[in-house]
Amino acid sequence: MTLSPEDLKTIEKYAYQNAVKYGKAPQPKAVMGKVMGECPQLRSDPNAVSEALKVIIPEIAKGNPETWETKLSEIAPELIEALSVKKEPDKGLKPLEGAENGKVVMRFAPNPNGPATLGSARGMVVNSEYVKMYGGKFVLRFDDTDPDIKRPLLQAYDWYLDDFKWLGVVPDQVVYASDHFPMYYDYARKLIEMGKAYVCFCKGGDFKRFKDAKQSCPHRDTSPEENLMHWEKMLAGEYEDQQAVLRIKTDIKHKDPALRDWGAFRIRKMSHPRPEIGNKYVVWPLLDFAGAIEDHELGMTHIIRGKDLIDSEKRQGYIYKYFGWKYPRTTNWGRVKIHEFGKFSTSTLRKAIEAGEYSGWDDPRLPTIRAIRRRGIQAEALKKFMIEMGVGMTDVSISMESLYAENRKIVDPIANRYFFVWNPVELEITDAEPTVAKLPLHPTDHKRGFREIAVGNKVLVCTEDVEKLEVGSIIRLKDFCNIEITSLSPLQAKLSDVSLEALKKAKAKIIHWAPLDGINVKVRGPEGDLNGIGEQGIAAELDKIVQFERFGFCRIDAVSEDEIVAYFAHK
């Protein structure tokens, strides 16, 4: 049979779905099974489908997980949705396969090119929780051997340590990969001597052509002695930037191009931001090489990482095989998409901050741990949020509202209540006498005490509340008095003798308010800044979480004579 254009589109979309799901080139058998299961009309000629896949899959394999997801979202967005877990991810932490109490060693290995993001937080929490579960050893390892593309940010090292402290985690060991160049060089020499690594002088495009054609490049069969000579020249700085690459010799005819003679070291004549390293080295290990050596030297028993790094395990497997090492048990998990932030990377965030688009790494609009901490998100809420995602291959699509719900459980019982009036309008109560309003600090915990506000015959209310009023409207100023609107311009009212019970029965509006002598308050949040007037008592809550009634929970960030700055957490 001849496949129609629609048939080919169907085969293509399922091939892309397979690539997105597993983070690697589509697997023909899996795609074939999916196509046959979903498309009965194609079952009569599996050979035609197989031949189509021989054309489609190599083209897809040229891309990467990001381009695959973009393409799939264009041609079959419903299949993207099918891969995402919407509400209840694979909750909780399942037992680690092969784990023994007291013998588990795990690591979290960030590139410190910026602070921890919400993406990083998953690895920070899950790895440390597993180690705690088994009474093992937890290692924080900074994979900081990329001097240019993902160049380390010096402050980020301390930021990670601070975020771990906030999470209540003290790593058993902190490792800086950039301290271990001599060790990497020693292992590289051993591989060269074994004939398992060689110095390649091909330009990038030339080597790719050899690799794609499954052919050896002219340098692949150079003797170990000559390769050692070139290697020492690389280390001595006798070659120019990117003139030579040390490659691990694998299977040049391997079906997966990503595994063919992959690069382990490159020349970059750049300084490292850590002063201890500076300009000491010109030959830099790539992540797959450095990570493989580190995981062995540190005695890792289990590794959890993204499914987009499945090929890393396969590449590193060659090194482990050559040295006779046992590879750690590895679990790959799916990507996490947080609706409110979409796709983001530390590199793009860093560029935006340097361009002045954000005030810093703790700008409330950013998906960093520093930002959500400043907003008042509690460590236990973040930990529970991350743990409940589970550890599975399926991509997780989740909302910050789930995190906010966990945080609300923690802060609602402890947050004192205050009034904050944004976009304020003056309201005159023509027959009111000066008094002192007494309001509870917490609606269900009166033992905590009360706040007292001196009030004359004028208060401030929100513009959006005023817009809903009419002359004759009877409303309640929360925890103060009942009033009847007598004029909208100017805004005036008189005291009303309607009982509170009658107001409730009539479902009359209850609005909050602020005194004329209140303090200026600026609330910073994901949607931008909002200015208004708040109670003077807010000034006593520096660095604490409060609830601005009818607005939301906020953390009081700064207090001065002129202004209070609060960071919005959530409703």
UniProtKB/Swiss-Prot annotation:
It comes from the Archaea. It is found in: Cytoplasm. GO terms for biological process: amide biosynthetic process; glutamyl-tRNA aminoacylation. One of its GO terms (molecular function) is ATP binding. It catalyses: tRNA(Glu) + L-glutamate + ATP = L-glutamyl-tRNA(Glu) + AMP + diphosphate. CDD domains: GluRS_non_core. Its main location: cytoplasm. Coiled coil: none annotated. One of its GO terms (cellular component) is cytosol. A motif ('HIGH' region) lies at residues 110-120. Keywords: Aminoacyl-tRNA synthetase, ATP-binding, Cytoplasm, Ligase, Nucleotide-binding, Protein biosynthesis. The keyword Nucleotide-binding applies. Belongs to the class-I aminoacyl-tRNA synthetase family. Glutamate--tRNA ligase type 2 subfamily. Catalyzes the attachment of glutamate to tRNA(Glu) in a two-step reaction: glutamate is first activated by ATP to form Glu-AMP and then transferred to the acceptor end of tRNA(Glu). This is Glutamate--tRNA ligase. The gene is gltX.
